Amino acid sequence: MGKKITKQDRESQISNICNDKNLSFVGWIGEYTNIKSTLTLKCNKCYYTWSPRLDNFLRITAQKCPACAGKARWTKEEREEQIKSKCAEKGYNFLSWSSTYINKDSKIILKCLKDGCIWDVSIHHFINHDTGCPDCASGGFNPNIPATFYIQKLTYQGTHFLKFGITGKDVLERMRQQSNKSLCEHSVIFSHTFSYGSMARGLEKVVKDSVNTGVLDKRILPDGYTETCHYSELETILSLTNSFIQENIR
């Protein structure tokens, strides 16, 4: 009969595995007695917590996070804890759900505590791809200095689309940056400069919430494809823009 492994030795064994797999050993459920005892683990990547039996965990194939492996179903409450943990790490606030929570593709609304930017992103991209504040990623959009809301006409294989957005740079310069890697022909058909970038950001959000966006594939327009829509939305966007300007510029 083999020597009984002590609790201390077991925890050392578990910790070594966890360090190698980017996991954290949280503790035991009940007292440790033998190989059939249950432990609690936490994934350091996605923050998922689960409780396997020790003998199951020690199998090589079981030494990975079930959520990262796509084998776990998250409750809404678990997702919110996961999101809040990630937000605390990144310097963001979790404001709300953009729509009803269904799965990893559901969208959330976040706020950057550094620059005040508010944006929406899917859980999958935020947690697994580390997608962060769009303003910080673009070099620091400043909400306190002038910025321009613009509309571009894009032509791809004979079909017209729209691309809207905001920039603290010259509109034509921004268009040249976007067109460098684009398969579309670009032209600016409307622009309005606000005294404060926060106003331009507010208008952009109004438009995003009102039209169907992301109609062009990222392979066609790598920079800014999420703010594309059908050309038939032009009148709607111009109407929203005029109303926004009249209501906010006194």
Swiss-Prot record:
Record's keyword terms, sorted: DNA-binding, Endonuclease, Hydrolase, Late protein, Nuclease
InterPro entries for this protein: CapR_dom (IPR048793)
Molecular function terms from GO: DNA binding; endonuclease activity
Enzyme Commission designation: 3.1.-.-
Pfam families reported in the protein's UniProt record: CapR (PF21817)
The keyword S-adenosyl-L-methionine is annotated on this UniProt entry: no
Induction per the UniProt record: Expressed in the late phase of the viral replicative cycle.
Task of the protein: Putative endonuclease.
Protein name per its UniProtKB record: Putative endonuclease
UniProt organism field: Escherichia phage T5
